[in-house]
Amino acid sequence: MCPPEGDAGTGMVATNTVTKRTGNVSAGTSVFAMIVLERDLSKVYEELDMVTTPAGDLVAMAHSNNCTTDLNSWISLFHECLTSFGVKVDANELFSTLYNKALEGDADCGGLLAYCYHSGEHITGFTEGRPLFVRKSDSKFNLANFIRVHLSTALGAMKTGLDILTKEENVTIEQILGHGGLFKTKGVGQTIMANAIGAPVTVMETAGEGGAWGIALLADYMNNKGNLSLDEYLSTKVFKNSVAETIAPTKEGIEGFETFMTRYRNGLAIEQSAIDNLK
């Protein structure tokens, strides 16, 4: 028997992200990133939660309440439109087609802006939310940029929290493992995520396994660890031959996402106005 761990610790084990300078991102209805730190942070940040790996290493968590819900609503609208014309399309095919379309868009989403706030976001200071899509008259308004901006904004609040780590605390992130619905369409969520974080994002075939499997691995570790540390055990005994695909960020992609994030931060007043005036 091993003592039960919380979702954070078992999730780290299930995704083999217990080593310093690594982390994992779970992205679906909500999204959170957990980064294993090399040292304590210089101060407390209300935007970040602090947990530990099962081995006791410090982990910073950036958690966002909202991720794919708003994008799912838009894709449902496209499905309704097609159905109105008598076109039958498989839901999985529609998601895959539209997600892949996003990769044809501009790195900065063509000047478009969206917020996926169905509920509040503590990282950006909102106790409630209003889903929004905003553009200027000269923005590059096309399908590719429309889908891309909704994928990008799904990571906006989380990115705001991670920027505290990377830009204010100089935390190095060498690799991220992604899991959750955002990564279901091969390569798309990974690409957006890699450019958002500025680090390679890996998705393993076991990424769908969650905390229950992590608990089982911890129990097996307690029985069979020998002289191995937890990260050595996971790397050599569990994940040594795992199948994974990694996508690295690009200079253009990183710069484009940073341009989008400037627009995202500057537009938060629009979100606040919507909350104040749309009751």
Q: Model regions: which residues?
A:
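Active-site core segments that coordinate phosphate-bearing ligands/cofactors
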Residues: M1-L177, L182-K279
